[in-house]
């Protein structure tokens, strides 16, 4: 049969369909990967138009709305403007080509247009669309070529309008006039004669003439400027009385040869801007509308030029087109069919079709409309990218006002039409003192109303691993975010890592929060350790990510009132961008701060009369509300693949801003409408298809009016009325629960999601009086309703409900979501019905476990028809599992109810214990041949594809080795007892290997911790352990079986299992010559022995033993394995096994042959296999050996791998308390066995991979909405006390200021920038003593300290103490030796014990003392620096820094110069070597900015300290060039910034060199052994220094080096043994932070700083904490003391804590020592830990981990400080990591303290 001819006809008019609907359809299908070519074409066309618009003049550009897709262009009527021709031409081209491409993809049609059979034709602009096809050889080329067609059509349209408007200006009123009329009943020649006459008589210029633009036999189209056409029809009698009709041509003249020329056309086309190669060849015939013949163009450039020339200058002759088509059709004489494709129909097309039918009556002529496919539904969208996905909301949770603490209560509240507003409760603030309706009280609220969550402080701290102290300080918003996040995830069935979309690295959180009441008010009353992580907004999300271990983005957003919905929109954007696969989003608001009430009231936001009255005449502002809500969102395709319950689908979401509003807080209807239009375009949804809008609806006059305007104009426009069956319902949840501010949007979203579930719209209760007169009065006519009663919202069959959710921010933001119904679930997978199902329940506390059991029981009592399989699937595969567990395997719901009732009534929960923190090890034990039976593992084979595939793959290998298939055995097709030894043994080993791999899958582990195989089972064990390949194991099993069958007689020998030791058997059977003979075959336990021998001998033995009361059982095997009967195969087996490779086991092998544990790769070899066949199985000895080595113990889990658990009893006998599970059991359904085994493993702490267990039939199961987790809640609440938010309004400047102790007169003339007051100075003939007081807060001293900052704190450098030492040293020396010119000094043995950190309160003195004693005969002066108590003026007993000054005997310094000159060349040599290394790029050269940028890793120097101009550094060696500042900046001996500049190179070497581990550590100097300067440093002086640091061999983590200072290549100073100690970076805060207590300020530090050395306390049984002495300075940098000591014991009952927070009821929930029984140091430590964390001592059980107790790194530092300061114990904070449990810590304390 010959191929048909094809005609594709492209018209020049839009179809009569709704243009927006057509483009919406294209846009919607373009998001589906089944329409990839269509999507690409739409994207390319959009890009082309964007580029063309961008090149337009500015006035024209402004006429085009911003567009990211084509939808906004369809919303604008361009015809009245200058872009009418351009846009209509481009959109028609896009529409026709888009429909063509989409039709091909929808029909999955292959390209079937050939050059000899296909013809293309078109009219006017339709020719350009046709050109896109004419240039193509396949569909993808149509996409590329089509974009160029769009470009050309747009440019031609712009040009036509530009020229035409120069011929005649548009109408002033904007009305449209036609540029073409069609005249019927006239011939072209007659009409041309009449037009020529008219044009001549009227003197019409050629340019403006009326002319013929198209013609056929019966009609003629007349074109020209509109006024000229009207004049012609009035003036010409022939025209006036002709039959004519104005055509819808409003944009200018085409087909006008007198108007356009080819040169202009070429310039307009601008071929250099083509988006395709202009040389692309023409592939298909495209007929000219003038000649009816194919265009003669051969390339794309020629074709577009020809078409454009014809469009602008050529006359259309419809008759020629028809003739050309008939001619092309006639050429295919052999064709019997003619297929025509077009876009709807037209008069022209009807005429063409009639002509074809008349000319070819024998041909079958069929027509295809290319439009209808766009309205078809092709099933669930298959998005081509994340950006095209619909999104699925799969989980939600909330805490809302009015007691709506869960979704059911929230819906109940809405359904009942309740109003939840009340007066402010007492737990927020005292309304009596903070409410003043008159407004006269500053900072008071003018309204007493709000909507509040009941007890928002309730929280299960233990569940979230938080201590009570941390929970108390954590914002309740953050806590409830955690709680609702968990509940939403639980509802969604999210289990981390279960599916690709639940990969924790790809889960993100987005929450909206707009206030910080708790941090600013409640927690700030007593700022504690957790003030920052507990109150800063970022931690709301961060805590969720951290707790659940989510690695995706974490964003906390503030967009004022729209924060919650904006967070949802941001979350959706992350999904569309592919940044995450699952998101948690929500909004948070808990009101406690009256300041915000005052601010909002004064800003006229709040209603003074009560609730939000949305759209009511009396609306007077909003009523504030609490609210916390969370939703879980995924891409729709992921949710469907994951078998999730889909609550609703998000089609689009967007946020914009009301930039044009009259004020920043005033809403703007225009911006709101723009946002609606944007989301509707994104979703490709008709606004009339929206059936519900959840209003933002604050109940303000301005807000209600603006939102009413925007909603009604877009969703119920007057110019496009809704039908009666298209009602639009409106509502606002704020009428019920008030305005939740940051949580308002999420509350609205939750309401709509519940409406989808309940198929009902709650009553709108926001109009207590009459509707606001600002609202349009024609709502009913526009089919818009505010339901005053509950209204049904059913989902009609095959229909989809769509809704809008609005949320607007007071700052001007507008957020809108478009929702639709979830797709109807189609269950296409048949479920394998399992006889028994596991059901598991878990919790994180005993109390919650009991409550969870009770709620599940209540659920089943209310829903007795619950499907057990669905329940099992939900509790096992779709729940997060916790440490307290119950599990059972049941066959029906009544059995489960019985189990749960027993658990409740028998208090089974109290007898449970939490699973261990580490999963117990698993050992696989493989049974031997005695476990065989027909149909082994049949149920698993039939139901589990993974197991079935493994068996079939192993069976395939076995068959390729030449052995028979064992599948018939599994399927029970082989009768019991008829299988050969070969089939029997292969069946067992194949099933065991497959079972092992199934268990590895179900347990989620790569390998067992050890394996042991019994007899035949050892082959499977060796294969699993990697000793043998699977193929080699099967080969050996099969070959050995063949040898046994060939060389051993079945039935001649047997095996007997005896319940006795081998010694008992020997004693009872005897050993004489007449005694029956036997051999030991297996020693299974110490009391279970298997012997083998001939049938006769074993029968005799059995008779004897049973006579003695010994139990005996015949082993059901045809041969006596492990006896002399096997000798017949040994030699042959040895030959077979010789070529088999053996490898080192990947896991320990418990060898029953060797009676030991095998780790090496040599013990198991070919000889081993032969011996194992002949020699006895020492199963008991192997287990004993494993126990002795600690490979197995009572905690080990044993999995019996085999058809029947024969080895289970052996293991139980050998390992007391052993827990062993079975794979299969004879005469028991496989899934009954498997379910029970999985439950056992689950309860033991080895959680199975439940997802894999249910994966085969997962789509056939349903996720049930079970009761939510029952929390063990305690009300953690810090009550706002007093009236300080009011009082602060009345504070005035002023107040007393303490007088600094340094302000009293000094008894000496000595006073410098660092020495402020000399309190004692005594001088005699040979000695002098000086005592001085200095204040760090003195401006000069403080400026010097702040020149050296660490951890953002000013820290005193060594140079400060050096200047003080030199100042006092020179002063006292001159007192004893008057007239001395220059005093040389050597600062020796200088050591700083503690850092001195400047307090932040500069108004409070921070004194220190310096004491010096000079002894002239010894030329020695001692120095000591002390802390001073600013309150008592008492100095500390011990100094924080010490040193001495030595005065050289030679006051000229000549001896120093001689000494240094001897080594100068060495120093210069090292400097030159460093320069050489730098030239070779082996050493680093650092500029000043780079050097001090590196220094910032530890210390930040002020500009005056930055003397180093250049540094060359290599490892721990360096030199630098230095220029000192010219200004001394104070009164000094030597300015500290000069001293530091010439010496801090050593600090840079240690803290900036790549040879140091600066990521984990920083390095600080405790001092030096000597510091000498032979000459004074000079202002602006240039110096060079050199240093090399070495590790000190006698002191760990300590470095030292000599630093040399040179001027003009001469050494002028040396710092000897300059030391640096390595300190963990995490202690930076601990050592370098200002003390909170100004009276107990921090101690000084050298540059960069000194840290206290670790001091070891001698072990002692009891160390009593000592109360600090008021007259002494306590150890530096300790935490502030508590007001009172902790009680000696903690109460276990619920009682208020020191902050008014109830302590949770404690339970003895785990085995271990009772903390209250721990005494001595350990007991006191536990009391301190309990006090600091807020826990009860009874909760510190031995197996409780510090992670579970909420002891994080921050708390660890606090505890270590407390233990040191209060008990004198030097304990590092990392001890809580090294001792992870309370028991570990108490053991360490008892041993070392």
Curated annotation (Swiss-Prot):
Its cofactor is pantetheine 4'-phosphate. Residues 923-1245 are annotated as: Malonyl-CoA:ACP transacylase (MAT) domain. Residues 1716-1793 form the Carrier domain. Binds 1 phosphopantetheine covalently. One of its GO terms (biological process) is secondary metabolite biosynthetic process. Residues 388-821 form the Ketosynthase family 3 (KS3) domain. Non-reducing polyketide synthase (NRPKS); part of the gene cluster that mediates the biosynthesis of the linear tetracyclic TAN-1612 neuropeptide Y receptor antagonist. The decaketide backbone of TAN-1612 is synthesized by the non-reducing polyketide synthase adaA via condensation of one acetyl-CoA starter unit with 9 malonyl-CoA units. The FAD-dependent monooxygenase adaC then performs hydroxylation at C2 while the polaketide chain is still attached to the NRPKS adaA. This is Non-reducing polyketide synthase adaA. The gene is adaA.
């Amino acid at each position: 049969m010959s191929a048909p001819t094809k005609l594709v006809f492209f018209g020049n008019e839009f179809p009569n369909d709704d243009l927006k609907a057509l483009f919406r359809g294209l846009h919607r299908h373009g998001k589906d990967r089944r329409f990839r070519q269509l999507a690409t074409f739409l994207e390319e066309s959009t890009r082309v138009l964007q580029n063309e618009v961008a090149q337009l003049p500015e006035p024209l550009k402004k006429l085009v709305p911003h567009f990211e897709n084509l939808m906004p262009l369809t919303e604008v009527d361009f015809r009245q403007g200058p872009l009418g021709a351009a846009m209509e031409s481009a959109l028609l081209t896009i529409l026709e080509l888009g429909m063509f491409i989409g039709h091909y993809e929808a029909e999955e049609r292959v390209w079937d247009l050939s050059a000899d059979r296909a013809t293309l034709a078109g009219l006017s602009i339709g020719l350009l669309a046709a050109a896109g096809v004419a240039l193509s050889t396949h569909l993808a080329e149509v996409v590329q070529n089509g974009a160029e067609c769009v470009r050309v059509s747009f440019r031609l349209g712009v040009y036509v309008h530009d020229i035409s408007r120069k011929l005649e200006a548009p109408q002033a009123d904007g009305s449209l006039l036609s540029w073409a009329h069609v005249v019927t009943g006239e011939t072209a020649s007659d009409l041309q004669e009449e037009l020529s006459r008219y044009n001549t008589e009227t003197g019409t210029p050629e340019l403006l003439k009326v002319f013929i633009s198209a013609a056929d036999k019966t009609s003629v189209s007349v074109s020209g400027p509109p006024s000229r056409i009207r004049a012609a029809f009035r003036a010409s009698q022939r025209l006036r009385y002709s039959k004519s009709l104005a055509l819808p041509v409003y944009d200018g003249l085409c087909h006008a040869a007198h108007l356009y020329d080819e040169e202009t056309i070429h310039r307009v086309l601008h071929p250099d801007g083509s988006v395709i190669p202009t040389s692309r060849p023409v592939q298909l015939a495209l007929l000219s509308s003038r000649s009816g013949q194919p265009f003669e163009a051969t390339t794309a450039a020629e074709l577009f030029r020809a078409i454009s020339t014809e469009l602008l200058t050529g006359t259309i002759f419809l008759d020629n087109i028809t003739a050309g088509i008939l001619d092309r059709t006639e050429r295919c004489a052999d064709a019997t069919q003619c297929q025509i494709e077009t876009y709807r129909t037209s008069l022209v097309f009807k005429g063409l079709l009639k002509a074809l039918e008349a000319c070819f009556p024998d041909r079958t002529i069929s027509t295809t409309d290319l439009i209808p496919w766009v309205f078809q539904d092709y099933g669930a969208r298959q998005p081509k990218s994340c950006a095209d996905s619909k999104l699925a909301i799969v989980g939600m949770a909330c805490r809302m006002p009015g007691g709506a603490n869960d979704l059911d209560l929230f819906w109940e509240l809405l359904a009942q039409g309740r109003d939840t507003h009340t007066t402010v409760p007492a737990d927020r603030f005292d309304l009596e003192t903070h409410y003043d309706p008159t407004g006269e009280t500053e900072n008071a609220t003018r309204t007493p109303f709000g909507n509040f969550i009941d007890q928002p402080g309730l929280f299960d701290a233990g569940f979230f691993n938080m201590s009570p102290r941390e929970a108390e300080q954590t914002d309740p918003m953050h806590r409830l975010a955690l709680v609702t996040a968990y509940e939403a995830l639980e509802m969604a069935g999210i289990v981390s890592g279960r599916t690709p979309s639940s990969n924790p690295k790809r889960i993100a959180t987005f929450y909206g929060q707009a206030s910080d009441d708790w941090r600013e008010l409640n927690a700030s009353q007593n700022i504690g350790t957790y003030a920052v992580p507990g109150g800063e907004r970022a931690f709301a999300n961060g805590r969720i990510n951290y707790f659940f271990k989510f690695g995706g983005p974490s964003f906390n957003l503030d967009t004022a009132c729209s924060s919650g919905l904006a967070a949802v929109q941001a979350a959706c954007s992350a999904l569309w961008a592919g940044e995450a696969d699952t998101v948690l989003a929500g909004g948070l608001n808990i009101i406690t701060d009256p300041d915000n009430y005052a601010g909002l009231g004064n800003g006229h936001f709040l209603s003074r009369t009560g609730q939000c009255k949305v759209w009511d005449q009396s609306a007077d502002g909003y009523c504030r509300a609490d609210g916390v809500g969370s939703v879980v969102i995924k891409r729709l395709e992921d949710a469907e693949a994951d078998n999730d319950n889909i609550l609703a689908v998000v089609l689009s979401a967007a946020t914009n801003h009301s930039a044009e509003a009259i004020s920043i807080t005033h809403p703007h209807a225009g911006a709101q409408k723009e946002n609606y239009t944007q989301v509707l375009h994104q979703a490709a949804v008709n606004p009339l298809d929206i059936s519900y809008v959840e209003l933002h609806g604050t109940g303000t006059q301005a807000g209600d009016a603006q939102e009413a305007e925007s909603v009604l104009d877009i969703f119920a426009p007057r110019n496009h009325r809704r039908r009666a069956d298209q009602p639009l319902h409106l509502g606002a949840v704020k009428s019920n629960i008030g305005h939740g501010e940051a949580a308002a949007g999420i509350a609205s979203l939750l309401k709509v999601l519940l409406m989808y579930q309940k198929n009902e719209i709650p009553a709108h209760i926001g109009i207590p009086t009459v509707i606001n007169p600002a609202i349009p009065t024609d709502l009913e006519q526009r089919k818009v309703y505010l339901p005053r009663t509950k209204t049904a919202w059913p989902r009609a069959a095959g229909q989809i409900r769509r809704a809008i959710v609005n949320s607007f921010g007071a700052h001007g933001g507008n957020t809108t979501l478009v929702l639709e119904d979830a797709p109807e679930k189609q269950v296409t997978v048949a479920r394998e019905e399992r006889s028994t199902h596991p059901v598991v329940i878990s919790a994180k506390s005993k109390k919650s476990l009991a409550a969870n059991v009770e709620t599940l029981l209540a659920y089943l009592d209310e829903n007795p028809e619950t499907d057990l399989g669905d329940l099992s699937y939900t509790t096992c595969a779709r729940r997060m599992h916790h440490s307290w567990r119950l599990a059972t395997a049941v066959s029906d719901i009544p059995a489960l109810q019985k189990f749960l009732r027993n658990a409740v009534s028998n208090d089974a929960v109290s007898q449970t214990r939490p699973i261990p923190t580490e999963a117990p090890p698993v050992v696989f034990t493989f049974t031997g041949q005695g476990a065989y039976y027909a149909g082994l593992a049949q149920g698993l084979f039939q139901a589990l594809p993974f197991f079935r595939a493994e068996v079939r793959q192993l069976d395939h290998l076995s068959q390729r080795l030449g052995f028979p298939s064992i599948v018939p055995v599994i399927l029970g097709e082989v009768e019991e007892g008829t299988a050969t030894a070969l089939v029997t043994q292969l069946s067992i080993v194949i099933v065991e290997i497959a079972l092992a791999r199934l268990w590895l899958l179900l347990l989620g582990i790569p390998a067992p911790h050890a394996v042991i195989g019994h007899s035949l089972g050892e082959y499977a064990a060796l294969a699993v352990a990697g000793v043998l390949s699977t193929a080699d194991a099967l080969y050996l099993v099969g070959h050995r079986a063949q040898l046994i069958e060939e060389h051993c007689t079945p039935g001649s020998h047997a095996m007997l299992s005896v319940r006795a030791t081998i010694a008992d058997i020997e004693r009872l059977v005897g050993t004489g010559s007449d005694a029956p003979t036997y051999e030991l075959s297996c020693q299974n336990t110490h009391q279970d022995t298997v012997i083998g021998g001939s049938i006769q001998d074993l029968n005799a033995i059995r008779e004897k033993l049973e006579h003695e009361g010994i139990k005996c059982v015949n082993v059901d095997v045809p041969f006596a394995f492990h006896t002399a009967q096997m000798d017949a195969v040994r030699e042959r087996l040895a030959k077979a096994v010789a070529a088999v490779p053996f490898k080192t086991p990947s896991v320990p092998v418990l060898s029953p042959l060797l009676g030991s544990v095998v780790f090496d790769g040599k013990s198991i070899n070919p000889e081993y296999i032969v011996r194992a066949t002949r020699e006895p199985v020492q199963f008991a000895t192997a287990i004993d050996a494993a126990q002795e080595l600690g490979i197995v113990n009572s905690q080990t889990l044993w999995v019996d791998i085999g058809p029947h658990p024969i080895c289970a009893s052996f293991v139980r006998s050998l390992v007391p308390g052993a827990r062993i599970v079975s794979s299969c059991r004879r005469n028991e359904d496989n899934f009954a066995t498997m379910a029970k085994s999985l439950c056992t493993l689950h309860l033991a702490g080895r959680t199975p991979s439940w997802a894999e267990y249910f994966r085969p039939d997962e789509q056939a199961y349903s996720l049930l909405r079970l009761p939510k987790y029952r929390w063990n809640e305690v009300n953690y609440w810090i009550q706002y006390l007093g009236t300080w938010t009011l009082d602060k309004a009345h504070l005035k400047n002023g107040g007393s200021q303490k007088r600094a102790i340094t302000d009293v007169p000094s008894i000496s003339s000595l006073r410098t920038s660092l020495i402020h007051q000399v309190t004692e100075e005594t001088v005699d003939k040979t000695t002098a003593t000086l005592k001085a007081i200095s204040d760090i807060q003195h401006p000069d001293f403080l400026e010097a300290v702040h020149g050296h900052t660490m951890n953002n704190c000013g820290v005193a450098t060594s140079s400060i103490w050096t200047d003080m030492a030199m100042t006092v040293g020179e002063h006292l020396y001159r007192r004893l030796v008057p007239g001395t010119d220059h005093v040389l000094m050597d600062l020796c043995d200088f050591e700083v014990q503690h850092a001195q950190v400047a307090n932040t309160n500069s108004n409070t003195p921070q004194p220190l003392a310096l004491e010096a004693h000079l002894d002239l005969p010894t030329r020695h002066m001692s120095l000591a620096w002390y802390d001073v108590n600013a309150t008592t003026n008492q100095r500390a007993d011990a100094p924080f820094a010490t040193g001495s000054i030595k005065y050289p005997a030679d006051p000229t310094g000549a001896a120093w110069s001689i000494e240094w000159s001897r080594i100068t060349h060495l120093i210069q040599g090292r400097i030159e070597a460093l320069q050489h290394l730098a030239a070779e790029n082996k050493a680093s050269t650092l500029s000043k900015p780079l050097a001090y940028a590196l220094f910032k890793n530890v210390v930040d120097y002020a500009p005056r300290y930055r003397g180093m101009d250049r540094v060359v550094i290599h490892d721990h060696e360096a030199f630098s060039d230095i220029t000192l500042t010219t200004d001394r900046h104070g009164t000094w001996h030597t300015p500290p910034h000069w001293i530091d500049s010439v010496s801090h190179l050593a600090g840079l070497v240690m803290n900036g060199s790549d040879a140091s581990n600066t990521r984990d550590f920083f390095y600080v100097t405790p001092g030096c052994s000597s510091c000498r300067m032979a000459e004074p440093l000079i202002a602006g002086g240039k110096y060079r220094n050199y240093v090399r640091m070495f590790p000190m061999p006698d002191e760990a983590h300590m470095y030292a080096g000599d630093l040399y200072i040179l001027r003009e290549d001469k050494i002028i100073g040396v710092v000897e043994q300059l030391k640096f100690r390595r300190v963990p970076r995490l202690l930076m805060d601990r050592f370098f932070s200002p003390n909170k207590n100004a009276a107990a300020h921090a101690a000084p530090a050298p540059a960069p700083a000194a840290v206290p050395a670790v001091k070891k306390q001698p072990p002692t049984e009891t160390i009593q904490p000592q109360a600090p002495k008021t007259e002494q300075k306590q150890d530096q940098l300790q935490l502030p003391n508590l007001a009172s000591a902790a009680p000696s014991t903690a109460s276990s009952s619920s009682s208020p804590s020191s902050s008014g927070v109830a302590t949770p009821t404690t339970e003895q929930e785990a085995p271990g020592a009772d903390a209250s029984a721990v005494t001595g140091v350990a007991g006191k430590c536990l009391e301190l830990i309990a006090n600091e964390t807020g826990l009860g001592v009874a909760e510190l059980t031995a197996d409780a981990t510090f992670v579970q107790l909420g002891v994080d790194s921050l708390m660890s530092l606090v505890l270590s400080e407390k233990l040191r300061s209060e008990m004198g114990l030097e304990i590092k904070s990392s001890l809580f990591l090294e001792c992870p449990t309370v028991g570990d810590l108490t053991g360490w304390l008892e041993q070392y303290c």
